[in-house]
């Protein structure tokens, strides 16, 4: 199944949006793209939000119809991740699994913290730099549990099935074998990346350990089941998430006409980023 993107506005502006299209029609990045590309073999569709080594904090918006990817803001200003030495921007292709939801109404029994109200995050570790709105087919290798400001924020470690090393990577121990140091660097980056913005160091459940593939698959299924309750209108509190979709006629928020209401593509050249975003931050004890 092939997906394309529809860009509106210039990257690095408040107007920037990327919709995902199927057969030229916008679909919801949150609800319409199937979680499973191949359920029998546990191959998942991943929606790429942030390409590796970039700084703009892009995410699937929860509040807008068909959930385009936009740049996050704080107090009306665009958000960028700072460069924490020796890293530059995000250290992986960063995105999410569609049709998943980390339920903020439920506390996880092992992390003792509620979900973060987002689709589950995915860190794709392959060699190719992805692009915003790309739908990759990946396999899950393991999972980490970030505790972000009191919420459980799962991070699935995955690899594009077309990556040259994908056949050799089948569980979390293979990551350390073929990508030595990557899991340690991932743990470090998530611990420190908010410090330059004046926030405390993040914490991890399980002492920062990356759990194995089986554990990851169980968590992915849990978040998929939570999404099923959400899209069916059965969640105790949907937290204002826009549930409009164009492919799920049995749901109360199905609207085939929603695609036609989306503006046509109007891409513009990337807007310049303030030079201050290039700064490197040196954090004690981070290397």
Curated annotation (Swiss-Prot):
Top-level taxon of origin: Eukaryota
Pfam families: Pyrophosphatase
Subcellular location, record wording: Cytoplasm
Record's GO cellular component terms: cytoplasm; nucleus
UniProt catalytic activity: diphosphate + H2O = 2 phosphate + H(+)
Keywords linked to the UniProt accession: Cytoplasm, Hydrolase, Isopeptide bond, Magnesium, Metal-binding, Phosphoprotein, Ubl conjugation
One BP annotation, GO: phosphate-containing compound metabolic process
Enzyme class, broadest EC rank: hydrolase
Cofactor: Mg(2+)
Active site: 90
Phosphothreonine found at: 65, 251
Modification Phosphoserine, positions: 266, 286
Enzyme Commission designation: 3.6.1.1
Binding annotation for Mg(2+) 2: 121
Family as reported in the entry's similarity comment: Belongs to the PPase family.
Comment field (misc): Present with 68400 molecules/cell in log phase SD medium.
Subunit organization: Homodimer.
Protein name: Inorganic pyrophosphatase
